[in-house]
Design a protein with these regions (language model features):
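Short, solvent-exposed alpha-helical surface patches in non-cytosolic proteins
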Residues: 185-199, 203-228
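Gly/Ser/Thr/Pro-rich low-complexity, intrinsically disordered segments
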Residues: 1-182
Length: 228
């Protein structure tokens, strides 16, 4: 499951209540949700987890991760000042990155990843197809992704997109939430004038493409005549 979209804002979620992605999505109202990074047997996240400046977990490394600043936009940075979630760096500016992986992370497994297109759009990968890191890098490069991070995978891989979902019975302590930014419809001067001057009713304005009857046309023309 893959989706590429304009992201308006994102959030790191610390799942202390052990909610499912569906429960979190219903509670918060995000458009996309995926599992986060690795965790230990005590349900504690490993690597860096920072939420609004509060450090939940940390390690000795200062590598790239999902960094969310005051504007709410996720980026692949090392800045941990706002919100931050670690990941395994896969790509930067279209170049493959390599990090030493433990055997359980390096093996073929279901994968979750977050990437960025050259134009800034976010690419989310959440799929049960078993891939190595190198195969995932190849898939993301094929989609045109320039920057990318690999998150937890295997049985942790889970997510919900507007057009699909990947399920898992495993609860995970961190998740990433995204809100797709919808393009605002272009303003139509004629419709704005009709609204401002009472030429069209609220019902007619709500359905601008609907054909009008002769009676409705006569009423519109009559209202225009009264204004002159």
């Amino acid at each position: 499951m893959v989706d590429i979209f304009v992201c308006g804002r994102a959030q790191v979620w610390h799942n202390t209540a052990k909610l499912t992605p569906a429960q979190i999505k219903a509670k918060i109202g995000c458009t996309h949700i995926i599992n986060g990074y690795l965790f230990n047997s005590k349900f504690q996240p490993v690597g860096w987890t920072v939420i609004d400046g509060t450090i939940i977990s940390r390690d000795a490394y200062r590598d790239w991760g999902v960094s969310i600043g005051s504007d709410g936009r996720p980026q692949m940075l090392t800045d941990r000042g706002g919100s931050f979630l670690s990941g395994v760096p896969l790509l930067k500016s279209g170049a493959r990155l390599e990090r030493n992986l433990t055997p359980d992370v390096a093996r073929r497994a279901a994968r979750t990843a977050v990437g960025w297109m050259p134009d800034g759009r976010v690419c989310l990968w959440c799929d049960k197809t078993a891939l190595t890191r190198e195969q995932l890098q190849e898939k993301l490069l094929g989609l045109g992704v320039s920057d990318a991070l690999m998150l937890d995978g295997g049985g942790s891989t889970q997510g919900i997109f507007p057009k699909g979902k990947v399920s898992s019975s495993r609860k995970v302590p961190t998740l990433l939430l995204f809100w797709e930014k919808k393009e605002e419809p272009a303003k139509e001067p004629a419709m704005e004038w009709a609204a401002d001057n009472g030429v069209l009713t609220a019902v007619q304005l709500a359905e601008p493409e609907r054909a009008v009857t002769r009676r409705e046309l006569a009423e519109v023309l009559y209202r225009c005549r009264k204004q002159t």
